[in-house]
Amino acid sequence: LITSSTHAVLDNDYGKSKKQSEDALIKYSDECDAKVYIFRLPNLFGKWCRPNYNSAVSTFCYNIAHDLDVWINDPAIELNLVYIDDVVASIIDCIEDENIIKLKNIDEEVAITTTGASSIQIDKYYYEVTTIYRRTLGNIVDSLKMFRNMRKSLLIPDLSDGFNKALYSTYLTYLEEDDFSYYLDKKEDNRGWLAELVKSEQFGQMFVSKTHPGITRGNHWHHTK
């Protein structure tokens, strides 16, 4: 099993080197009747990836986590992205020969979201990770800046979105230890005090409060909120 690159179809030195590696493995498979798995990965991102190397996402995460400038030439450029955990799940499933969709032809439409499969078998040799995210550079940077501002805004992202969850998990690995704690804005009067913990456009807000003895606060309910 090897992870190749979607650049293998390009007519440049990098693409040619990837294609030659694939061809060598295919030749071995044909000569020895051995099962091989070739994954052509698009842009790979994930936790603890080395910044300022070959992953734009890791560089963005590192820079924004450290309040460094991020420069992008065209925010509208769209990337195809795979998350490292999904790649690992696909590799394990191939080894165990389970959770794999086998296509009859490369143009076949597959209801990936309802199958639960981690991999698609394109042909005898080639496989794809089913979960591929498509996001623009501008969208990625905006999301990361929102994460950085969370300590002030207390607004958390929509973690029901798979990409947001993967990107946030990735971003956290670039924070310094001191960045994991932060002060809350404590509001206090003669009744007691309260402080907001988190807010979300999906579920409202959560806060902690303390009421002094003999004081009644709230004392009402909501039919709908």
Which positions does each model-derived feature cover?
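SDR active-site strand-loop-helix element
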Residues: I2-T6, F39-L41
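Conserved catalytic-site region of short-chain dehydrogenase/reductase
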Residues: T6-D13, L44-W48
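Active-site Tyr-X1-5-Lys
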Residues: D11-P42, S55-H66
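Residues that recognize and position ribonucleotide moieties
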Residues: Y37, N80, Y133, K187
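A conserved pocket-lining segment of Rossmann-fold NAD(P)-dependent short-chain dehydrogenase/reductase
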Residues: P42, Y62-V82, K102, I112, ...
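Substrate-positioning beta->alpha
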Residues: C49-T59, I77-E96, K102, T136-D142
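Mid/C-terminal beta-alpha module of Rossmann-like enzyme folds, strongest
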Residues: E96-K186
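A short glycine-rich, His/Asp/Glu-containing loop-to-beta-strand
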Residues: D179-H223
